[in-house]
């Protein structure tokens, strides 16, 4: 009589542990899909923390079965929830509609004072700058319809006063 009662208690406890182990796994998977879509790192970490505690508590009575199932899956659940949360807040982020202040920037209709900057319709005062319809005062500058006063400058329809200059329709002083 004692053996049958003991075996019934083991079956009931084992069945309840399997049910308890399956509920957190379903909740973890649901929590992962919610955190991936809504990007809420707090909810994923708190649920996985509470469920891993109950998994460890039930794992002490049954031995190795619930420990292996909940241990492996809760580990993957916690790692995926943390990576899902970290994608929202990190370096190398892409922002739209914000002011970017850095080198090698491309501006339109503004005054660019830096190296390797591309400006259109504005005065550029830097080396290796490309300007259209404006006065360029720098080396290796390309100007159209303006007076260029530098070495290796290409001018069209204007007076060139420099070495190695290419002029069209005017007298060259080389």
From Swiss-Prot:
Membrane topology reported for the UniProt record: Lipid-anchor
Subcellular location(s) per record: Cell membrane
InterPro entries: VlpA-F-like_signal (IPR049890)
Start and end residues of each stretch annotated as Disordered: 32-174
Record carries keyword tRNA processing: no
GO cellular component: plasma membrane
Protein task: Responsible for the antigenic diversity for host adaptation.
Protein name as catalogued: Variant surface antigen B
